[in-house]
Amino acid sequence: MLRYPYFYRTYNRLFSHFVDSGASNLDVCPHTIHTAVALHTESKAVEGTALCGPQKVYSSEEKELEAMAKLHIPVMVDQVVHCLAPQKGQVFLDMTFGSGGHTRAILQKEPDVMVYALDRDPVAYAIAEQLSRLYPTQIQALLGQFSQAEALLMKAGVQPGTIDGILMDLGCSSMQLDAPERGFSLRKDGPLDMRMDGDRYPDTPTASDVVNALDQQALASILRAYGEEKHAKKIASAIIQARSTYPISRTQQLASIVAGAFPPSAVYARKDLLQRSTHIATKTFQALRIFVNNELNELYAGLRTAEKFLKTGGRLVALSFHSLEDRIVKRFLLGISMTERFNLSIRQKVKQTSQLDSDQETEERHSVRAPLKWELIHKKVLTPEDQDVQDNPRGRSAKLRAAIKL
């Protein structure tokens, strides 16, 4: 059953420390288990820093990709374009190309721009490649993770401090959720996979590997840290009990196991922001997806890359879909360390200090404080308007933060 014994040992060594220090404490453990697995992989995919990607997309596949792209509705697209404010001759980086909705909107607003279209998903990369053939001087497709973005950009000839606007549309795309074979959705049965990179890295653990290999305490830690699941112990116990009879390999199989740990009345008792019933396993699926794809560490790496490649006055727009993502984005823009317990910005700390310390001590603290690196475009986070939610209910939990690099 344990297809990845090294994965199991490395988890016990790294993740327990990661959880103890806080789910968003990225300074304490900047590399999770996935880094260690990659170092001990004998069969690796094509290097993520290569500009080449999947094999050529043929006409029948092109039609399918085009249909997928048309079905996807980009989240808060008007607000995104407004915040990026594209101007003639500017350069943009879409770090989560997906099906290209936001990139298309940027080009519709201002055709005379260059967009580097990055995505870790080979399917999204294929769509970006297809679109780049229609707009060869406006779009260049890049295949890779956030942590590989710097090398990809340098290889493409993009120097630090030269990009005018960067977009990050975080989380799982509708395209991934709607493909049962990808294993992201509990509503459609498929293999319990959840790897955003697809088969590019064959030895990367799948969600099935996680639920079949880790012990109860480890599983509960993942559900609690990444799904903010208050019933983490109960769900982990149900998973352990079920897998002792048969391996857990399908999405709806896992959903049924989680549901079986609760009375029938509780399975759809939770409500989303639209007051619609949600399945009790939703947070479990979120937690596994975040863990499998190392999403929080990748997000932090992506934010650091964005800061490095944006020019002074360049704009960063980040769309997040749950509190863990939003907390990291907020702290990064406000200059708050990921190890801090409270979300106090540098400016707030200085103000707090001035109320408590003497004038001399305050002056000393002012002289050593870190400079602010971002100016927020909006004081408060933006959320979807009613029409946005009506057009795209999946984007109901979106939070948009935008800032200008100082």
Curated annotation (Swiss-Prot):
Entry annotated with the keyword Mitochondrion: yes
Location, primary (coarse class): mitochondrion
Enzyme class, UniProt record, top EC level: transferase
Localisation per UniProt entry: Mitochondrion matrix
Modified residues (Phosphoserine): S358
Keyword terms of this UniProt record: Methyltransferase, Mitochondrion, Phosphoprotein, S-adenosyl-L-methionine, Transferase, Transit peptide
Cleaved signal peptide residues: none
InterPro entries, per the entry: RsmH (IPR002903), SAM-dep_MeTrfase_MraW_recog (IPR023397), SAM-dependent_MTases_sf (IPR029063)
Entry keyword annotation includes Amino-acid biosynthesis: no
Chain segment of the transit peptide: 1-22
EC number: 2.1.1.-
Amino-acid positions noted as binding S-adenosyl-L-methionine in the UniProt annotation, renumbered to this chain: G100, G101, H102, D119, F146, D169, Q176
Entry superkingdom: Eukaryota
A Pfam family per the record: Methyltransf_5
GO biological process: rRNA base methylation
Reactions mediated catalytically: cytidine(839) in 12S rRNA + S-adenosyl-L-methionine = N(4)-methylcytidine(839) in 12S rRNA + S-adenosyl-L-homocysteine + H(+)
GO cellular component, one term: mitochondrial matrix
GO molecular-function term, one example from the UniProt record: rRNA (cytosine-N4-)-methyltransferase activity
HAMAP family registered for this protein in UniProt: 16SrRNA_methyltr_H
Function comment: N4-methylcytidine (m4C) methyltransferase responsible for the methylation of position C839 in mitochondrial 12S rRNA. Involved in the stabilization of 12S rRNA folding, therefore facilitating the assembly of the mitochondrial small ribosomal subunits.
The protein, known as: 12S rRNA N(4)-cytidine methyltransferase METTL15
Organism in which the protein naturally occurs: Mus musculus (Mouse)
Lineage, top ranks: Eukaryota, Metazoa, Chordata, Craniata, Vertebrata
Gene expressing this chain: Mettl15
